[in-house]
Amino acid sequence: MAPAAATGGSTLPSGFSVFTTLPDLLFIFEFIFGGLVWILVASSLVPWPLVQGWVMFVSVFCFVATTTLIILYIIGAHGGETSWVTLDAAYHCTAALFYLSASVLEALATITMQDGFTYRHYHENIAAVVFSYIATLLYVVHAVFSLIRWKSS
């Protein structure tokens, strides 16, 4: 009974099928929007270094971790083991929580920038907030599908 339960659920894809399965297809969009967040925050003025430092940490950490995971999935490093399904679900739940906190803090930092900063820097931060919330949504959706896959594995 235990081997059937371990092999009966969804497994992680390997090779280029990573780009054709629903939750793993979101890696591409997480990569794009996460990269845009840290590029925009890095290019703008930083009114609150501690707040935007957290935003930078979260966006760069998730960018590097997402890149690492997608490369490991493409080369098939997981070998079909269920522990990787658990890792995938745990990572995406943590990333979703971190990105939500970073999005709220970036919005707070942007609100405080209304006066005394250039129009360009203010709009860069507005774009960073929008892309940060999009990245948060992507990580939440990926986390939900990863938890469903984890439960069925």
Swiss-Prot record:
GO BP: any one term: protein localization to paranode region of axon
Kinase as UniProt keyword: no
Superkingdom: Eukaryota
Post-translational modification: Lipoprotein.
Domain MARVEL: 18-151
Cell location: Membrane; Cell membrane
Stretches assigned to the Extracellular side: 47-53, 115-125
A GO CC term attached to the entry: apical plasma membrane
Coarse class of the protein's main subcellular location: membrane
Membrane-spanning parts: 25-46, 54-75, 93-114, 126-147
Keyword Cell membrane applies: yes
Pfam families, alphabetized: MARVEL (PF01284)
Subunit structure: Interacts with PLP1.
Disease: Leukodystrophy, hypomyelinating, 28: A form of hypomyelinating leukodystrophy, a group of heterogeneous disorders characterized by persistent deficit of myelin observed on brain imaging. HLD28 is an autosomal recessive form characterized by developmental delay and nystagmus in infancy, followed by significant learning disabilities and progressive motor deterioration within the first decade.
Protein family according to the UniProt entry: Belongs to the MAL family.
Protein name, per record: Myelin and lymphocyte protein
Organism encoding this protein: Homo sapiens (Human)
